[in-house]
């Protein structure tokens, strides 16, 4: 293995005897993305974290290829699965950036159970950072209502996603029944119900992109929150933007199943939704659909006085919901992340490690002060990762390109890379 990949869970003492962690699998150096997930699933000790690094590129994956049976147009079909399934806990998947590291699948059949670019199945404590997952149905950009999942979670707890982009049309992100997930600085793109499912899911500073839907109004979320949960979907300090045709047409959400909950807190709505805000679905009554300090594109309070409070139940009887469609300040404070996750604190786990100041010697060695919080250093040449080291220096190999810049990025415990350091030019003249 190269680029400092190592056996699963390997630890390397640095020059001061501190434990540093290596990446266990580097894509594509050590194999494909599908091979990396397979290696994580089949490692003997799943109690230790397994770190996958994905170098910047666009990867079109075919999935595991196992035969699965689906129902289409009333008929059963056996197809080759386009899904890649992670079943092991304690796995990190980290790229170089969500704008330049893309994992794309191309499912040929619609549906939640046969399209997931990445399916997290019982994969507790998964950490994903700095990449994009795209479910590109039939490679057909006109299929704006296709039901194709980019990320699917099932029976997972404690997942953290940082700088992750998810793109599809309908069902882009199918969330975690019975689970908990934290998203920070992520982007979710879609058309209909493109955030749907159960669990307690906290979207912190995320961007929600409304994709073009042939002039029809989009619906952002369709929660299926379990009845015993105090929290469902929490959108905090997010931004809604996208196709200009969605102005005044789209809906924030609709109640799919169970006891749906969704709140939008301090959300910038660059495109305003339909004045009703919420719509109906299948006779399900929401447990709570509400907002607090929604903002328009001029950062003024958005109009919310006409938000829907009446929904039809399964018997087609109109019910006036008893909750407030606009939260009081005291009610909104209950959705502080420390109240939603009082013992977990995922925002601390996703913290990035600040870079050091990098210098270069006449000999061609670059060096920096050691960063105690860093579990690994990524060496960048012209901003692309070319090597890793656990020591606070890097000797540029002989024969390397001339007149190029080098910088350093530090990895946190989970393997996510922080910002780049200052750049130095090789050779030093």
For the regions a language model picked out, list residue spans one by one.
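Bacterial Sec-dependent N-terminal signal peptides
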Residues: 1-12
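Sequence-level preference for short, compositionally simple segments enriched
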Residues: 12-381, 385-429
């Amino acid at each position: 293995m190269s680029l400092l990949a190592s056996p699963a869970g390997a630890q390397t003492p640095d020059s001061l005897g501190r434990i540093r962690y290596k990446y266990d699998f580097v894509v594509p150096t050590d194999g494909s993305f599908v091979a990396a997930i397979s290696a994580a699933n089949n490692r003997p000790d799943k109690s230790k974290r397994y770190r996958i690094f994905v170098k910047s590129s666009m990867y079109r994956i075919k999935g595991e290829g196992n035969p699965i049976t689906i129902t289409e147009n009333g008929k059963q079909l056996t197809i080759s699965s386009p899904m890649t399934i992670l079943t092991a806990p304690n796995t990190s998947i980290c790229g170089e950036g969500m704008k330049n590291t893309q994992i794309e699948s191309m499912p040929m059949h619609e549906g939640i159970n046969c399209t997931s670019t990445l399916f997290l199945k019982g994969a507790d404590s998964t950490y994903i950072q700095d990449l994009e997952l795209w479910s590109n149905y039939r490679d057909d950009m006109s299929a704006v209502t296709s039901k194709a999942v980019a990320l699917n979670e099932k029976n997972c707890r404690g997942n953290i996603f940082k700088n992750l982009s998810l793109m599809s049309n309908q069902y882009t992100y199918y969330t975690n029944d019975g689970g908990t997930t934290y998203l920070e600085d992520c982007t979710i793109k879609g058309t209909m119900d493109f955030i749907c499912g159960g669990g307690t899911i906290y979207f912190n500073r995320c961007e929600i992109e409304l994709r073009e839907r042939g002039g029809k109004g989009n619906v952002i979320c369709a929660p299926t929150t379990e009845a015993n949960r105090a929290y469902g979907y929490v959108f905090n300090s997010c931004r809604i933007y996208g196709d200009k045709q969605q102005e005044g047409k789209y809906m924030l959400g609709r109640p799919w199943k169970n006891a749906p909950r969704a709140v939008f807190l301090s959300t910038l709505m660059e495109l305003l939704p339909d004045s009703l805000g919420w719509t109906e679905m299948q006779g399900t009554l929401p447990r709570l659909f509400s907002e607090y300090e929604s903002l328009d594109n001029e950062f003024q309070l958005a109009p919310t006085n006409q938000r829907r409070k009446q929904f039809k139940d399964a018997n087609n009887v109109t019910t006036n919901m008893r909750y407030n469609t606009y939260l009081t300040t005291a009610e909104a404070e209950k959705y502080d992340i420390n109240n939603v996750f009082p013992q977990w604190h995922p925002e601390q786990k996703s913290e990035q490690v600040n870079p050091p100041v990098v210098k270069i010697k006449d000999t061609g060695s670059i060096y920096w002060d050691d960063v105690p919080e860093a579990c690994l250093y990524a060496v960048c040449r012209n901003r692309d990762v070319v090597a890793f080291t656990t020591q606070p220096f890097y000797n540029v190999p002989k024969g390397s390109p001339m007149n190029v810049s080098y910088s350093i990025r530090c990895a946190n415990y989970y393997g996510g890379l922080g910002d780049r350091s200052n750049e130095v030019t090789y050779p030093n003249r």
